[in-house]
């Protein structure tokens, strides 16, 4: 998957298009991600026991990973990620849009 937990991403499609948030959870089986404060849904919960009251829960629903792109806050640009090796041979992630500017 092209994104990791903790990445800052920009939403490309849907009702939250253009918003920026951080990935809090990754669901690998379905290639979905949960982004903080994005795609917030409400669920109405009926009371289960006598004397209990109903609730309205808010939660962040997952969105497909193809609908997000990694966001660079320093240059304020969303870009795909390329992998390169540094001097010590360690793999690092580099923004493709920033490769052409250097």
Curated annotation (Swiss-Prot):
Q: Which GO terms describe its biological process?
A: translation
SMART domains tied to this protein: KOW (SM00739)
A Pfam family this protein belongs to? KOW
**Compartments, record wording:** Plastid, Chloroplast
- Chief localization class? plastid
Q: Which UniProt keywords apply?
A: Chloroplast, Plastid, Ribonucleoprotein, Ribosomal protein, RNA-binding, rRNA-binding
Q: Name one GO molecular function term.
A: rRNA binding
Matching entries from InterPro entries are given as: KOW, Rib_uL2_dom2, Ribosomal_uL24, Ribosomal_uL24_CS, Ribosomal_uL24_KOW, Translation_prot_SH3-like_sf
GO terms for cellular component: chloroplast; ribonucleoprotein complex; ribosome
NCBIfam families under this entry? rplX_bact (TIGR01079)
Function noted in UniProt: One of two assembly initiator proteins, it binds directly to the 5'-end of the 23S rRNA, where it nucleates assembly of the 50S subunit.
Family from the record? Belongs to the universal ribosomal protein uL24 family.
The subunit field of the Swiss-Prot or TrEMBL record says: Part of the 50S ribosomal subunit.
List, alphabetically, the HAMAP family matched.
Ribosomal_uL24_B
- UniProt-recorded name of the protein: Large ribosomal subunit protein uL24c
């Amino acid at each position: 998957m092209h994104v990791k937990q903790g990445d800052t991403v920009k939403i490309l499609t849907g009702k939250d298009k253009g918003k920026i948030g951080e990935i809090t959870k990754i669901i690998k089986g379905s290639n979905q991600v949960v982004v903080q404060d994005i795609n917030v849904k409400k669920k109405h919960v009926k009371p289960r026991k006598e004397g209990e009251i109903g609730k309205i829960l808010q939660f962040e629903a997952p969105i497909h990973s193809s609908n997000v792109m990694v966001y660079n806050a320093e240059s304020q640009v969303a870009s795909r990620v390329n992998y390169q090796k540094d001097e010590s041979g360690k793999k690092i992630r580099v923004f493709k849009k920033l490769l052409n500017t250097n």
